[in-house]
Amino acid sequence: MNVTASLSRRPLGCLKAGLCQSLIRGYATAVAASTTQSTGALPDHNFFRIADKHTKKTRTAFAVFTPPKSPTTLPPSSVVTKSKAFKIANSKLPPLMTKPPSDPMPLLTQQQIARMDPTGARTALFSKARHAARVGDVLMVTHRRGGEPFAGVCLAIRRSGIDTAILLRNHLGKVGVEMWYKIYNKNVAGIEIIKRRAKRARRAKLMYMRQPKHDMGSVEQYVFAWKKMRKVLSSKGLTGGVGGGGGKQKGQESKKKN
């Protein structure tokens, strides 16, 4: 009696799980019935049809393009033949861009010198030619802003492009004075050669002339002689030379005496 009561009290959850598994297997193995519907029975959809207001005709919302009647052909001018391709290949191509210089400073220096010295007189005066100024010559620099010109012996010529400069030495009041002048400076009105050195110096810089043994002293006597000679030459040019102007003056004086 007690055994049957205990069996009747057991839960039935295991039976529910077994029944669910059998139902799932039946659904998986069952053959689905094919339901075919005739196309004629389907309703005609009018979703993409639009009625024209003027002609009252229906038109679809999609654009329909008809195929061209004849295949598209290119114009004869656009067709590239072998002869035309050969002519194009052998035609002169435009010149390529020149390669920029690796060092643009020399070109810039030349442009600056051409702007500061358009005639090229100062560049030729301090070039390495024979007729150019050398170290040891007596030079005179005239300022553009007025004042007394400075004359002295050229001790050195520093050639460095647009910054080319000369060093002049003179004595003012028994005191040695040296001045640097840039030849391309706008404030320098002119540079004159007062006296040339008799013999070419062996050195590029005559710094030994600062010593009392080799010091040239004041150059005022050379400047005075140069100005006197220049004045004589200018007076001869105004009077028409020695043979012309002098003869006329003598003739006028003889007439006055008579």
Swiss-Prot record:
It is found in: Mitochondrion. One of its GO terms (molecular function) is structural constituent of ribosome. GO terms for biological process: translation. Residues 235-258 are annotated as: Disordered. The keyword Metal-binding does not apply. The keyword Ribonucleoprotein applies. One of its GO terms (cellular component) is mitochondrial large ribosomal subunit. Disulfide bonds: none annotated. Keywords: Mitochondrion, Ribonucleoprotein, Ribosomal protein. Residues 238-249 have a biased composition (Gly residues). Belongs to the bacterial ribosomal protein bL19 family. Component of the mitochondrial large ribosomal subunit (mt-LSU). Mature N.crassa 74S mitochondrial ribosomes consist of a small (37S) and a large (54S) subunit. The 37S small subunit contains a 16S ribosomal RNA (16S mt-rRNA) and 32 different proteins. The 54S large subunit contains a 23S rRNA (23S mt-rRNA) and 42 different proteins. Component of the mitochondrial ribosome (mitoribosome), a dedicated translation machinery responsible for the synthesis of mitochondrial genome-encoded proteins, including at least some of the essential transmembrane subunits of the mitochondrial respiratory chain. The mitoribosomes are attached to the mitochondrial inner membrane and translation products are cotranslationally integrated into the membrane. PANTHER family: LARGE RIBOSOMAL SUBUNIT PROTEIN BL19M, RIBOSOMAL PROTEIN L19. This is Large ribosomal subunit protein bL19m. It comes from Neurospora crassa (strain ATCC 24698 / 74-OR23-1A / CBS 708.71 / DSM 1257 / FGSC 987). The lineage of its organism: Eukaryota, Fungi, Dikarya, Ascomycota, Pezizomycotina. The gene is img1.
